[in-house]
Amino acid sequence: MPSCTGFNHLALATGDLEATIRFWRDLVGLPLAASLGKPGARQYFFSAGNGAYLGFFEWPGVEPIPEKDHGYPVQGPFGGDHLAIGLASPEDLWALRDALDAAGFWVSEPLDHGFIHSIYSFDPNGIAIEFSCPVPEVDLETQPRLVDRDPGPAALEGPQPQPGHWPPVTEPVQPEDRRVYPGEGRAFIDQPSRV
């Protein structure tokens, strides 16, 4: 099993990179960590802390998606419900709630989900977002809480990875044969930074 360290990044799309920067950096407070590309084909990454990034591709012609209530089922092809960003404390949650409201964005009242307290809103691209702070006495990392009333067979096997459900690797790439090819992000190393 690989050792996962968390999410590295989530990549989304925008047709208005300026509004996206103003929202995520200047209103929400995620520092701009990296950028590359040229007009019409740019990528920007905001640091969400602990090595996790929120990335946006700027694609001309992309329009904000229709707002969809968080957690409500839809039918047909669909890829994701909402993006949740962790906050350190209840004070951060209330401060961000007030900032979103003052900036004219719809924002929910805080909700108690048992292990987190959350507010909900939408970014300028129509992306459904949640901001959550932990409930200190509940730690799902060390004490998972599986309370589904009708779990399927896979869930009944418990929270930890279970062996034997996928074929074993029989022909791993040998260290001397491993190659990493340059991608667009190589510009982070090859080009001088503007800041």
Predicted features and spans:
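Glyoxalase I/VOC metalloenzyme domain signal
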Residues: 1-7, 13-33, 48-106, 122-195
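Short acidic/glycine-enriched loop/turn segments that link adjacent beta-strands
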Residues: 38-42, 113-117
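N-terminal strand-loop-strand beta-hairpin
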Residues: 43-47
